[in-house]
Amino acid sequence: MDFDLTDEQRAIQDTFARFSDERIAPQAAALDEARAFPRALFRELAELGFFGMRYPESVGGSGLALSEFCLALSEVARGSMSLAGAVAMQSLMGTKFLQLLGNADIVERLFKPALRGDRIGAICMTEPNAGSDLESIATTATRVDGGYVINGQKTWITSAPVADFFTVFARAGDEKKLTIFLVEKDVPGITVGREIHKMGVWALPTSEVAFDGCFVPDSHRLSKEEGDGEGHLKKTLAEIRIITGAMALGVARAALFAAVRYAGERKQFGKPINRFQAIQLKLADMATGLEAATTLVHRAAWLCDMKRPHHKEAAMAKLFATETAAGICDDAARVLASYGYAMEYPVQRYLRDVRFTLIGGGTSEILKLVIAKEVSS
């Protein structure tokens, strides 16, 4: 049993840790306040090869494992959860089905430019009445000559206001099963609606997307067969949960570092507050929780890399890491007391942003049902 990182993994972690410290963290607050998509940093990460880490060299990627990707993504999240959410979408959900199922034209014209940061992708799955309940997805794709006509409403679509193309889940065929389509932003019948004002991740734009008689040619049906979308989605969900856990680790580490630093500098009753047992116990709990969460996330990623069963472990990792991170961010705000409530300190941003990880990829309540089903089978 070896818990050490390989030399390559350590080099990847160090590269993105430096980038986070030198490029992301200094801009994070300003980007957050401006509610501005971090396009320049997005492109810089593309130049570092971030978007191609998980894809094979044959299509312009670097063929790295999920474990390496999680190390890098966690460092990005440590600097900015908004940026981490954007690059996670670009690296997996927004592009995976193009690479996996798209034809040569789609790969050359959209997928490869996306790896370079020249195109931005998003996934359209959630609907006003279909969140955790995928069976309630109501968007339809009706067969016509030469393709399909899509009608429906999607919401909570990450990166939609800046996206160039969308991977859309809609019901098609006689049995109305989920089918995957590619829709480009400029085609008639697609409307990117109002931007949703959120509690956190202010620099990550999220909006509604409407499809009203939107024609999609046969060549843009990504599904090999009508109705195979749910199967592809289930295979991807475990990865989504693991990388969401990795993002939670990043913001938790940032919050713990802020709390430790403040507790060492802040003096009350003639000594630093980290000399008081109440603060020491809180810091100990935060550090222990983070260590345990890190182990769960990286083991789940390793199981995925080894192509071993990992759906239960992915759900456990996401559940524990995100809930633990939320607690760490809350405790950090308590350590800073009034300053944890002040906008000039980053802890308030960590506390707002961490909730993003509690929702994406499945809520904690849904994950518990997944875990219970796995352990009971």
Swiss-Prot record:
Involved in degradation of indoleacetate, the most common member of the auxin class of plant hormones. Catalyzes the irreversible oxidative decarboxylation of (2-aminobenzyl)malonyl-CoA to 2-aminocinnamoyl-CoA and CO(2). In vitro, shows high catalytic efficiency with benzylmalonyl-CoA, a chemical analog of the physiological substrate, but otherwise accepts only a few medium-chain alkylmalonyl-CoA compounds as alternative substrates with low activities. It holds the Pfam family Acyl-CoA_dh_M. Its cofactor is FAD. It catalyses: (2-aminobenzyl)malonyl-CoA + O2 + H(+) = (E)-2-aminocinnamoyl-CoA + H2O2 + CO2; benzylmalonyl-CoA + O2 + H(+) = (E)-cinnamoyl-CoA + H2O2 + CO2. The gene is iaaF. The expected physiological substrate of IaaF during indoleacetate degradation is (2-aminobenzyl)malonyl-CoA, which is not available for testing. However, the missing amino group in benzylmalonyl-CoA does not appear crucial for substrate recognition, since the compound is readily accepted by IaaF. InterPro entries: Acyl-CoA_DH_CS (IPR006089), Acyl-CoA_Oxase/DH_mid-dom (IPR006091), Acyl-CoA_Oxase/DH_mid-dom_sf (IPR046373), AcylCo_DH-like_C (IPR036250), AcylCo_DH/oxidase_C (IPR009075), AcylCoA_DH/ox_N (IPR013786), AcylCoA_DH/ox_N_sf (IPR037069), AcylCoA_DH/oxidase_NM_dom_sf (IPR009100). Homotetramer. Belongs to the acyl-CoA dehydrogenase family. It is an enzyme of class 1 (oxidoreductase). Signal peptide: none annotated. FAD binds at residues 123-132, 156-158, 266, 277, 363-365. Keywords: FAD, Flavoprotein, Oxidoreductase. Its EC number is 1.3.3.17. This is Benzylmalonyl-CoA dehydrogenase. It comes from Aromatoleum aromaticum (strain DSM 19018 / LMG 30748 / EbN1) (Azoarcus sp. (strain EbN1)). One of its GO terms (molecular function) is flavin adenine dinucleotide binding.
